Amino acid sequence: MALWGGRFTQAADSRFKSFNDSLRFDYRLAEQDIVGSIAWSKALVSVNVLSVQEQQQLEQALNHLLQSVQQDPEQILASDAEDIHSWVEQKLIEQVGDLGKKLHTGRSRNDQVATDLKLWCRDQGVHLLLALKTLQQQLVAVAAEHQSTVLPGYTHLQRAQPVTFTHWCLAYLEMFERDESRLTDALARLNTSPLGSGALAGTAYAIDREVLAADLGFTRATRNSLDAVSDRDHVMELMSVASISMLHLSRLAEDMIFYTTGEAGFIELADTVTSGSSLMPQKKNPDALELIRGKTGRVYGALAGMMMTVKALPLAYNKDMQEDKEGLFDALDTWFDCLQMAGLCFDGIKVNAARTLEAAKQGYSNATELADYLVAKGIPFREAHHIVGVAVVAAIGKGVALEELCLAELQQFSPLIEQDVYPILTIESCLEKRCALGGVSPKQVAHALQQAQARVKS
């Protein structure tokens, strides 16, 4: 059943109908469409379009339809309705007859779909916030188990300075907490009700839109009808939040993929998130992590596509906007799945502390400590930096670590170097000296972990 047939003398070409119809994807807005329709029916009572008895009859039928949809949303796809709004109205008329035809009074599909989409985004936001919080809790739990596990820190993917596995976990916690903050902000910004904006110029009925907004749980009604029906900022903002978070997930995945390699051997993932090779029986591939990394581009593509769609649209509604849903649905579904999968990768993870410590001791990651030692002896840092660089070259030439050079050899680079240098060059000293807020000293890491544990509980 089309909602607009009176103007036309010819039926739509079947190919156009297939091209134009959106039910195959906007059926996911069914619950929101029904909830919005219930609220609209109450508003129609206030302007004497519906009697109280009629509204109650409509609400009862809509609630029955809502229960049916919640039990089996896929049933909608068997219909030939143009979109979810048509389907709901058709089903309502089947239940209550001509009374169902009164529901759309004063309402356009333009403000209807804008409302549905915001309600859907709000509902999805709750699930995404929970998924982010769950991943944060998993990171903190793993971090708590590895406070004494030394890990090589990298710049340019070259060993740089030692850190700890806890510090590494908490670095990603910071990223996902920012994602949570961004999502919370975006959800607060979208929480305004377009319902009652009509097609573009507002509704002709003196409905109290603030009451209507409150009935649907919005903080307020939108202020401009032209903007309300054509605004898709919230779609792009949520996809942008998803894109940034997927970037963080991809970086996490890349780190962990590297850590699982035979060359690193820092961690081992559980069998439950890895796969094998059809040819090479020895393989254990980090497929879950690789898919997270791969799906990141998919979310970026959805955001870019949406921005290209709306970049030159005139006010107000245009059919181009029908393209907002598939990309949004896919982007948020993908983000949610990847958040869950990232958490799953931490279940049963094994950290090879002996190997991470061995790797942290290699690569002359204590060279900065020797430079700082010389600074303490009164040598300007830039000069100390050069002296240590020359010493590193000599150690490399001998195939030994800096701390394996004897005192006489070290004094060739600076006579100020004394026996007390050797305790300075240990891994323990390297960590201990990073004692400022946010550093890797055991005290600072313990403090950071304690704070993180408190945050993820709230």
From Swiss-Prot:
Family: Belongs to the lyase 1 family. Argininosuccinate lyase subfamily.
The protein's Enzyme Commission number: 4.3.2.1
Domain of life, source organism: Bacteria
Gene3D superfamilies in the cross-refs: Fumarase/aspartase (C-terminal domain), Fumarase/aspartase (Central domain), Fumarase/aspartase (N-terminal domain)
CDD domains on file: Argininosuccinate_lyase
UniProt xrefs under HAMAP family: Arg_succ_lyase
GO biological process entries: arginine biosynthetic process via ornithine; L-arginine biosynthetic process
Keyword Amino-acid biosynthesis in record: yes
Localisation: Cytoplasm
InterPro entries: Arg_succ_lyase_C (IPR029419), Argininosuccinate_lyase (IPR009049), Fumarase/histidase_N (IPR024083), Fumarate_lyase_CS (IPR020557), Fumarate_lyase_fam (IPR000362), Fumarate_lyase_N (IPR022761), L-Aspartase-like (IPR008948)
Main location: cytoplasm
Disulfide bond residue pairs: none
Name by which UniProt lists this protein: Argininosuccinate lyase
Metabolic or biological pathway: Amino-acid biosynthesis; L-arginine biosynthesis; L-arginine from L-ornithine and carbamoyl phosphate: step 3/3
Record-level Gene Ontology MF annotations: argininosuccinate lyase activity
Group of enzyme by EC: lyase
GO cellular component terms, A-Z: cytosol
Pfam family, one: ASL_C2
Alphabetized UniProt keyword annotations: Amino-acid biosynthesis, Arginine biosynthesis, Cytoplasm, Lyase
Recorded catalytic activity of this chain's protein: 2-(N(omega)-L-arginino)succinate = fumarate + L-arginine
